[in-house]
Design a protein with these regions (language model features):
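Extended, charge-rich alpha-helical segments
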Residues: 2-28, 34-221
Length: 221
């Protein structure tokens, strides 16, 4: 979309019948996505909390993996502390923000909340001091539910993207369509970690920190 690369003009269009129809279809699609995603996420939580005390892989179904700590560049404080250098090294980008009016919100069920709380209390054992959980009928059934939802979700996610893109084309250079959507695009100055490292490695190091290692849970698809 060519309009994604330019600032909006601040104008809001009046909605046409075509735009109202797209909006209605988009909300219906999002309603379906929420329903399927809830089924998928619930199955995932049940797999993850099968061992109530520890993080455990389930043979052939799901596993945990360690993610290396990522570097974090404190752009906000660097800009405050060194505005002149920021100005010299920065470049302009368009920051888009697309939102749907009368959008749908997902409400977590009590079962969902309880499983999340249970997972919060689980512990990760660094040493491989226990085996993976063996598959059983219940676990295979849960995995099948997750897989079914995973496959079912994809065409609706694609449809959602296509409908959103249709609205963006109709918005064009404007800021949005009244009661339908908003697509704000503003210029913003940006700086990269690599640009600062090339300019002054010692200064850059003061604004680069290492985050905490993360544990990621993955279900086999």
């Amino acid at each position: 979309n060519q309009y994604a690369l330019i600032e909006d003009n601040g104008e809001e269009l009046k909605p046409s019948s075509e735009e109202k129809d797209i909006h209605h279809e988009l909300l219906e699609t999002k309603q379906t996505i929420i329903k399927i995603k809830n089924e998928k996420d619930l199955a995932k939580l049940k797999l993850r909390s099968f061992d109530k005390s520890f993080y455990r892989d389930i043979e052939g179904i799901c596993f945990y993996e360690k993610i290396k700590p990522q570097e974090k560049f404190d752009k906000v404080n660097f800009e405050k502390d060194h505005p002149d250098i920021f100005e010299e090294l920065s470049f302009e980008v368009i920051t888009p923000n697309f939102t749907i009016k009368k959008d749908l919100k997902n409400k977590k069920s009590e079962e969902f909340k309880k499983l999340e709380e249970l997972i919060e209390e689980q512990k990760f054992i660094k040493e491989d001091s226990f085996d993976s959980i063996n598959r059983n009928k219940d676990l295979i059934k849960l995995h099948s539910k997750w897989l079914d939802a995973h496959v079912e979700l994809q065409p609706f996610e694609l449809k959602k993207k296509l409908l959103e893109n249709k609205l963006k084309v109709l918005v064009g250079e404007n800021q949005g369509i009244k009661d339908i959507c908003s697509w704000k695009r503003k210029k913003k100055k940006q700086i990269t970690k690599n640009a600062l490292l090339k300019f002054d490695p010692e200064l850059a190091k003061k604004y680069i920190s290492i985050g905490e290692p993360q544990i990621r849970f993955k279900v086999n698809d």
